[in-house]
Curated annotation (Swiss-Prot):
Belongs to the eukaryotic ribosomal protein eS8 family. Disulfide bonds: none annotated. This is Small ribosomal subunit protein eS8. Residues 7-26 have a biased composition (Basic residues). Keywords: Ribonucleoprotein, Ribosomal protein. GO terms for cellular component: ribonucleoprotein complex; ribosome. Gene3D superfamilies: 3.10.290.70, Ribosomal protein S8e, subdomain. Coiled coil: none annotated. Residues 1-34 are annotated as: Disordered. It comes from Theileria parva (East coast fever infection agent). The gene is RPS8. GO terms for biological process: translation. NCBIfam families: eS8 (TIGR00307). It comes from the Eukaryota. One of its GO terms (molecular function) is structural constituent of ribosome.
Length: 188
């Protein structure tokens, strides 16, 4: 039958049917959603209108994530999908979509921090001055995540359209908001 993005098949406000006076057109076509899963990388090219290409990611396992307050971006491994405002089904099936909250591997950021500041992240050092310096640079909530080995991040690209899974590390108010939402879900 084919997925169509027309409105001829819709009913009127009163509930009556519209008379269908023309067939489906090529420019109204829709495609099934990619539902990008967490796994080894698999990206397919899709030819679109005007000869343009879309990159349909079927499986992804890594992406470029930026740490906004430190102004650094690193390629890192996506470990898990933990929250999605759209649907719990997308969390259960580990589907990567825009604005999904995922956990990423903090190792690349730890290495950068070590080379840039000369300080260890996530480890409680014996030197109190070093730990004070780290505390001044990185908020407590982020330090806890670095020590646990799982950073919360948000996907800002569209994996089903561009074939990439890029995003940013959650910080500040946004991190607190999503933490509260996840705690609320756990309690229910």
């Amino acid at each position: 039958m084919g997925i169509s993005r027309d409105s001829r098949h819709k009913r009127r406000l009163t509930g009556g049917r519209y008379p269908v006076h023309k067939k489906k057109r090529k420019y109204e076509l829709g495609r099934p959603s990619s539902n990008t899963k967490l796994g080894s990388k698999l990206v397919r090219k899709v030819r679109c209108r005007g000869g343009n290409l879309k990159f349909r990611a079927l499986r992804l396992d890594s992406g470029n994530f930026s740490w906004g307050s430190q102004n650094v971006t690193r390629k890192t491994r996506v470990m898990d999908v933990v929250y999605n405002a759209s649907s719990n089904e997308l969390v259960r099936t580990k589907t990567l979509v825009k604005n999904a909250i995922v956990t990423v591997d903090p190792t690349p950021f730890k290495l950068w921090f070590k080379t840039h500041y000369g300080l260890e992240l996530g480890k409680s050092s014996e030197d109190p001055q070093a730990s004070e310096k780290v505390a001044a640079l990185v908020p407590r909530t982020l330090l806890d995540q670095f020590s646990s080995g799982r950073l919360l991040a948000c996907i800002s690209s569209r994996p089903g359209q561009c074939g990439r899974c890029d995003g940013y590390v959650l910080e500040g108010e946004e991190l607190n908001f999503y933490r509260r939402r996840m705690d609320k879900k756990k309690r229910v």
